[in-house]
């Protein structure tokens, strides 16, 4: 999609790459490659070339083990390495009818007593303690960047 947009003359400032570790064996390598894109002059992503003259900033928003960790952090500091099913059970015990791609998930989490600011704080704390090891998530980077738009 980035290549097509650039070819159409669109200006792209940021590319957000979001992914879970789950059973992805190249998780750490993918994270490093995305972060490294900001430091290289010419990028080769799956044989597609982007030149940094476009001033694109690349962001790696990982979740290790899964995205559902980010949702649990709205409520508490969750520092045990867990699987997706455990995170989903935690959310359901909070009364959240969680399913993948749940619309308005942020609003539902807040209605149930969760806080975006809490999730950001705990995600940063996990990253400081764990790096990208399980459990950790870089979703706070996306949230911090767009929080101003959410408040409008």
Model segments located where?
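C-terminal accessory helical subdomains adjacent to catalytic cores in phosphodiester-
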Residues: 2-14, 21-152
